[in-house]
A protein has these predicted regions:
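Hydrophobic helical h-region of N-terminal Sec-dependent signal peptides
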Residues: 7-16
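Aromatic-residue-lined binding/catalytic grooves and analogous aromatic/hydrophobic interfacial grooves
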Residues: 148, 179, 189, 201-205
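Short structural boundary motif marking the start of a folded domain
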Residues: 27-31
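N-terminal lobe/hinge region of extracytoplasmic solute-binding protein
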Residues: 34-88, 221
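Bacterial N-terminal signal peptides that target proteins for export
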Residues: 1-7
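Extracellular/luminal re-entrant pore-loop and selectivity-filter region at the outer mouth
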Residues: 568-570
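Active-site-proximal polar cores
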Residues: 562
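Extracytoplasmic/periplasmic ligand-capture domains
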Residues: 17-24, 68, 84, 92, ...
Length: 601
């Protein structure tokens, strides 16, 4: 053998030896859990559903976010360099960005690193006003009074031309590469809440939107800790750590008496985020398969124990002994949400502000047995809702009582009799005052959990002599129909993204029809009070007007308030650091998984 051949053989042998002795890479840390409803897509301005926003909230980044451990809440900078500079009249907000933040790599950037700059947020906020985007959040941002944006929208609508993103507006502009200025028509003391929703107003890059025109929902590209790797619509979502994510370390501000929060802070402070490598989400709409998937360790987190299985998982509010022996972890919290039955105020049967239709809605509301819904399908995991103001919001009072939670079939029947909803032909069913059939239609979902509610509704309406039919469809189809006004009654929930009552109040605000006002309710007196409440600082004057709005909502009954939900989460022992966000959706980056369990899937 030649010297050269011998040397080559030795080199090959050494290389093989090194390969044989090289340590195996650490197992991938993957958070696995399931959504109970399908996502709709991943373009923030087009989204109105919680589950899609939960994904976008980890891909995109807003200027601010909610501290992970602080309770009830603390707003802290995300991409902003600090808190905003706010004028004394609360109409001018100046915000500086951290330099050196980059979007995830994408072909839309043509091979260059793309830094986040102030103009990206200008573009992001303009998109809410672009008629072509059809943002369900348009009215939420319109009512903030960002000067010039609504006029730019009107110009596009009247000219039938594309929205002009290049025209500067007074209300949102870049003063320099890293400084954003907002100017508002009226004082907005709580404007920072609108800047703290990564799932809604996280920065998007114009190049990405233009590169994937018409397919924006499929191509989310942000600056956040995760990026979309795989998506099978309504089935499976996989996200992976963004390799270009800047250095962000674990820091939070738990209350002094928060033992768990203090323990998480002591354990993780200074760790680089995210601490896990990937997130895999399955869409499992039926409760039993979702529960079994978790027990079979196909998921390591059960984000919301299905109500059907709370007696098995947490009997009497305590972790079941068989789960405790296996070191499972459980958390329980009252959600900042409200669950209600919307009435379509434009529907000829249940809509309208005339006395007869108001009486019909109030009678239906009095005839709905909320206590049965709580004790039955919900297995005690809810409390009756009195108003649209959710727990932990300004204006929420646990002792405040309205007619909304009353169950009084006798009074309901009396109201129906008084306003001419009578059984004229003796068949046991009421007719409308003009003699035409009275038939209600409830939109629902085709699974065992929702069918329990259908049975309660059918029984309750039969007790009143009212026919009820049910139309079942998947969640995204129902939401699409409801947003288009193609429904009569729909039962659904809404989780707060901020600690203000405004989100609940907006659900009956006339200008938000087509957005959050799914009931399509329009009452000038209510709208005038809403405008006042928006401009006032928190305090007695604002609370007094808020209460007047709630009285009007109770009187006209555009929705039947049902419950505020109690949420229960369950995790395998390898998951550490979890806490359900009180507001916002971000938690993936703050959790960790122990290596053995991360590899056990």
């Amino acid at each position: 053998m030649s010297l050269r051949a011998a040397a080559l053989a030795l080199l090959i042998g050494l290389t093989a030896c090194q390969r044989a002795t090289a340590p195996a890479p650490p197992p991938e840390k993957v958070l696995r859990y399931a959504f109970p409803a399908a996502e709709t897509g991943f373009d923030p301005p087009q989204l109105a559903d919680l589950y899609s926003r939960m994904v976008t909230g980890h891909i995109f980044e807003a200027l601010y976010r909610y501290d992970y451990l602080a309770r009830p809440f603390l707003v802290v900078p995300d991409t902003a360099a600090g808190l905003p500079e706010v004028s004394t009249d609360q109409r001018t907000w100046t915000i500086r960005l951290q330099p050196g933040i980059y979007f995830a790599d994408d072909p839309a950037f043509k091979g260059r690193k793309r830094e986040l700059v102030a103009e990206d947020y200008v573009y992001t906020f303009k998109r809410f006003f672009d008629p072509a985007v059809k943002s369900p959040l348009f009215n939420s941002y319109r009512q903030e009074g960002i000067l010039g944006l609504e006029a730019l929208r009107e110009r596009a609508l009247k000219s039938h031309r594309a929205f002009d993103y290049d025209t500067p507006v007074e209300g949102v502009r870049a003063l320099d590469r890293y400084t954003i200025l907002f100017r508002l028509a009226e004082p907005r003391p709580r404007f920072i809440f609108q800047l703290a929703s990564s799932g809604a107003c996280g920065a998007v890059a114009r190049e990405v939107i233009e590169a994937y025109r018409g397919h924006e929902m499929e191509h989310p590209v942000g600056t956040g800790p995760f990026m979309l790797e795989q998506w099978r619509r309504s089935s499976f979502i996989r996200l992976v750590r963004n390799p270009g994510y800047r250095t962000v370390t674990y820091d939070a501000h738990p209350n002094a008496d928060d033992a768990e929060g203090q323990a998480w802070l002591a354990r993780f402070k200074g760790r680089r985020l995210p601490m896990i490598d990937a997130v895999e989400i399955s869409i499992i709409e039926e409760n039993q398969p979702r529960w079994l998937s978790f027990l079979n360790h196909e998921a390591n987190l059960l984000y919301g124990i299905p109500e059907d299985f709370t007696p098995q998982a947490i009997p009497h509010g305590r972790l079941a002994p068989n789960l405790a022996r296996r070191h499972f972890q459980a958390w329980r919290a009252l959600a900042s949400d409200r669950y209600m039955a919307y009435f379509n105020m434009k529907d000829p049967v249940v809509g309208g502000l005339d006395p007869a239709h108001v009486a019909l809605r109030r009678a239906i509301s009095l005839g709905v047995d909320v206590a049965r819904q709580i004790s039955g399908p919900r297995h005690g995991q809810a409390i009756p809702a009195q108003t649209v103001v959710a727990p932990f919001n300004f204006g929420y009072d646990p002792d405040f009582k309205t007619e909304a939670s009353d169950f009084d079939p006798a009074r309901a029947n009396a109201l129906l009799d008084l306003y001419g909803y009578l059984d004229r032909d003796g068949d046991g069913w009421r007719e409308q005052p003009d003699g035409s059939p009275l038939v209600l239609e409830l939109r629902s979902q085709p699974d065992s959990f929702y069918r329990q509610f259908e049975e309660i509704w059918l029984r309750d309406m039969t007790r009143l002599g009212i026919r009820l039919t049910v139309r079942e469809a998947q969640w995204p189809e129902n939401l699409k129909a409801v947003r288009a006004g193609q429904y009569m009654i729909w039962q659904a929930g809404y989780t707060n993204a901020s600690p203000d009552a405004q989100i609940g109040l907006e659900q009956m605000y006339g200008p938000s029809i087509g957005g959050l006002n799914l009931a399509r309710f329009k009452l000038p007196a209510y709208d005038a009070l809403y405008d006042e409440v928006e401009a006032l600082p928190d305090g007695p004057e604002r609370l007094e007007r808020l209460r007047r709005m709630l009285q009007l909502a109770t009187a006209y009954a555009p929705m039947k308030l049902l419950v505020h939900r109690v949420v229960n989460d369950l995790a395998w022992p390898e998951l550490t650091g979890f806490r359900r966000p009180a507001f916002g959706v971000q938690f993936w980056e703050y959790i960790d998984l122990t290596a053995p369990a991360a590899a056990a899937h």
